[in-house]
Design a protein with these regions (language model features):
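Histidine/lysine/aspartate-rich catalytic loop segments that bind and position anionic ligands
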Residues: 110-120
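Ser/Thr-centric signal marking residues that sit
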Residues: 10-12, 116, 155
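Buried hydrophobic packing segments
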Residues: 97, 119, 155-159
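Conserved non-catalytic scaffold segment of RNase H-like nuclease domains
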Residues: 1-111, 125-126, 132-146, 186-194
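Acidic two-metal-ion nuclease catalytic site recognized across multiple nuclease folds
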Residues: 160-237
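Acidic, divalent-metal-coordinating active-site segment for phosphoryl/phosphodiester hydrolysis
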Residues: 147-161
């Protein structure tokens, strides 16, 4: 059966995960791209870092009259709720989604997600780089980098290409081929998308067979905590 999924991409106003200023969505149904959308978003707090502006070109003036993420959530939620979400470096994009929802006190949606960085590294190990722009150049996919809708479109194209090149037709086949553990978001936690560890000797696995697969202790606070970074000068001005 052909795969249905939604590729997403966030751009942020600062290095803080919850400072989303743009979201791109690319909907794929029956292996066909059917919708590409971009939402401009007014971040909370309304602060921009010049470094981020240089990357994506979104200025405070461009979003000052746009809705905040909580105002857009009723529109965005149907695109992600109970869907398979795909992102290039999914830990960032799902982290941005959860951090932003947490900022507004909104319950997380329920969804599964996979990462095209992890997949492309295994699918195309000889490529010089697996950054989205370089990966797409190697695959002949044309897009405009660091525009959220374009990045979501490119990410969708990458997954469709991997499925085609390896003759795969389902999420189960994809995960089996590339030894991937699907990431999950629940109303109170986020479980990472990981490469499965190779099985150890049987005596080791027998002792652990009763251990639950989803570690629910990966709670909200942990899910939205971004890596501690030294604040950049431009962030603190």
């Amino acid at each position: 059966a052909p795969m249905d999924f939604v590729a997403i991409d966030f751009e942020t106003a600062t290095s803080v995960y919850s400072s989303v200023c743009s979201m791109g969505i690319c909907v794929v149904e029956n292996d066909e791209i059917v919708t590409v959308k971009e939402f401009l978003i007014k971040p909370t707090p309304f602060v921009f870092n010049s470094y981020n502006i240089k990357i994506h070109g979104i200025t405070p003036e461009m979003v000052e009259n746009e809705p905040t993420f909580d105002q857009l959530w009723d529109t965005i939620k149907p695109y992600v709720q109970n869907k398979l979400i795909v992102a290039h470096n999914a830990s960032f994009d799902t982290g941005a989604l959860c951090a932003t929802l947490h900022t507004y006190g909104i319950e997380f949606p329920t969804l599964k997600y996979i990462c095209t960085v992890k997949l492309s590294q295994d699918a195309y190990p000889d490529f010089p780089s697996h950054k989205l722009n370089n990966l797409c150049a190697s695959l002949g996919i044309t897009f405009s980098h660091h525009h959220a809708a374009e990045d979501a479109y490119a990410c969708a194209c990458v997954l469709l290409r991997i499925m085609h090149d390896y003759n795969l037709s389902s999420l189960d086949e994809l995960c089996e081929k590339f030894n991937l553990e699907v990431g999950k978001i629940y109303p109170n936690c986020r479980v990472p998308c990981l490469k499965k560890k190779k099985k150890k000797a049987k005596k080791d696995t027998a002792a652990k067979k009763d251990k639950p697969k989803c570690n629910i202790s990966y709670k909200l606070k942990k899910a939205v905590k971004s890596k501690k970074k030294t604040p950049k000068k431009s962030d603190t001005i």
